[in-house]
Regions:
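Metabolite-binding pocket within alpha/beta catalytic cores that recognizes anionic/polar moieties
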Residues: 2-127
C-alpha cells in the first residue's frame, strides 16, 4: 500500500513560516470566506491581520471585493483559535491549480483540524 503524503514546496514553506511567526498559535479552524462574507470577521477578538501582499512570494487576489488577507483571532467569548482567508483564488483568474488550492494547503500546514470553505453563488432567471 502506498500512502499519499501532503507535500509543500520551498516557497510555500516560507509563506507558512511567515504566517506562523505572526499568529504565534495553532488555529483549530480555517475558513475560506467567499464574496460578501467578510462580516464573519466581526465574530473574532484578539485579531491579527496578515495582508497577502506582505507574505513573501504569496499570490494576490484579483477579484473585486476580496480583501486579500488572512485574519487570525479567537471566537468572541471563547478560546477557539480561527484563521480566515479573506479573499480566495479562482481558476478563471488564469492561475495554476496549485495556486487555486493554496489556502487549503496553508490551513493544513498551520494545523487546522477543521477547514470550512464558503462561496457566493447565484443564478439568472429569465423573465
Amino acid at each position: 500500500m502506498i500512502l499519499m503524503r501532503h507535500v509543500v514546496n520551498y516557497l510555500q514553506r516560507i509563506m507558512i513560516e511567515y504566517i506562523k511567526n505572526i499568529i504565534n498559535d495553532k488555529p483549530s479552524i480555517g475558513v475560506v470566506l467567499g464574496s460578501g462574507l467578510n462580516s464573519l470577521i466581526d465574530s473574532l477578538e484578539n485579531i491579527k491581520r496578515i495582508p497577502y501582499n506582505e507574505i513573501p512570494s504569496f499570490i494576490q487576489t484579483t477579484v473585486k471585493g476580496h480583501a486579500g488577507e488572512f485574519v487570525y483571532g479567537t471566537v468572541k467569548g471563547t478560546d477557539i483559535p480561527v484563521i480566515f482567508a479573506n479573499g480566495r483564488f479562482h481558476y478563471y483568474e488564469g492561475l495554476e491549480y496549485k495556486n487555486v488550492h493554496i489556502l487549503i494547503d496553508i490551513f493544513y500546514e498551520l494545523g487546522c483540524q477543521k477547514i470550512i470553505t464558503t462561496n457566493s453563488s447565484g443564478c439568472l432567471i429569465p423573465m
